[in-house]
Amino acid sequence: MARKDRMSGNEAVSFAIRQINPDVMPAFPITPSTEIPQMVSTYIANGEIDTEFVPVESEHSAMSAAIGSEAAGARTLTATSSAGLALMWEELLLAASNLMPIALALVNRTLSGPININCDHSDGMGARDTGWIQIYAENNQEAYDNFIQAYPIAESAGVHLPIMICQDGFITSHAVENIELLEDEEVKNFVGEYEPEEFLLNPGKPIAVGPYSVTSYAMEAKKNQEIALENAKDAVLKVAKEFKKISGRSYGLFEEYKTKDADYIMLLIGSAAGTAKQAVDDLRAKGKKVGVIKLRLFRPFPADELATALKGAKAVAIMDRTESYNGNGGPLGSEVTAGLFRNKVMIDTVNYIYGLAGRDFTVQEVYDIFADLEDHIENGTKLEQFKYIGLR
C-alpha cells in the first residue's frame, strides 16, 4: 500500500534508489545533485542497501567506472549536473554505443559561462545527441516515479541503452513537496533482478567490450544503436502501462493539459509546466482556448506523436530553457518545427528562450505569450519566430 510523505526531489530519487538497490554507484559530487550520492552512501552505511559505492576523482571517472561495472554485469547508476555531465561527454558516447543500460540521475543546472549554479536545461540538451534516453520530470513525484521506471525501460529487450532521469536543479531537487511512495517490495518486484544478456564475467560466453571498429563495420553498429533508441519509445509506453497498475499514476511520451479544443498551445519541458498550467487555468476561466503540452520523453524524440497532438491548434509556443547558439532557435524549437513540417502540419510556431541560469518564469509571462500568439493569428501582428522572454 502506498504511503504519503514529504520529500525534496533529491530525496525522492535517493529513496527510489534505496528501493531498487542497484549493484554499483560510482559518483563525484557536484551541486545541485550532491545530495543524491550523499543520501545513497548513508543508506549503504546504515545497512539498508548493499550497493557498492565507488568514490572517484571526477565525473569522467564516475562514468568510466559505471561503464566498467555495467560491462561486468552489474546494475549501475550515477548522478551529476552541469559541468559534471560535460566532463563525462566522451564516456556518455561510449556507454550508449556499447548498449549499456546505466541510469543517470541528472539534476539540471546551467553550463558555464558566466559561472552560475542555477537551473536551465543546457546540460541535458547539450548531451541530447549522445545516444542516451532522456526523460524529464515536472515535480518531485515524477522524479521518483521516473527513476523507478528507468531500469525497466533501459534494460528492455531491443533497447539496452543508458537513460537519464532529469529534474530541475533547486526548483525540484531542493524544494520539498508532498509525495506518494510505493512499498519497497512493490518497487523491487516491478524493477526485477538484472539479467544482462552479455557481460564480461561470463566464462561460458567470452565477449569483447568496446573494441576498435573498422570502417567495414562501424556504420552498421551506429545504425543498430539508432534502432535501439527508436525501440525505446515503445518501451517507455509499455513500462508506463505496467507502472500504472502498481501506482495508479499515468505516464506517456508527453502530457496534454486542456489541449482538446485549444487554439493556442504552449509546449515545454520540466517544472515550468506547473506555471504554464496555472496560467492556462486562469485564461480558461476567461474563455480563452489555451492548453499545455509537457514533454516527458525528449530522447527518442516523439515527433510524429507531437505533430498529431498539435495539428488542431492555430499556433504553438515552443519553450526552450536553453540556448543552442545557432541563430535559429533552441533544441526543442528545432525538433518540433522539423517534426511538424515532415508531418505536413502547417501551423504557426514561435520559439521562446526562457529561464536561463535560474531566471524565474512567471504566470504573467505565460499570459503574455498566449496574448502574442492570439494577436498574431487574429490581427496579423508580425512575430519574431525566435525570441527571448523575461530579459531585463
Language model segments and positions:
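Thiamine diphosphate
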Residues: 1-126, 131-132, 148, 389-392
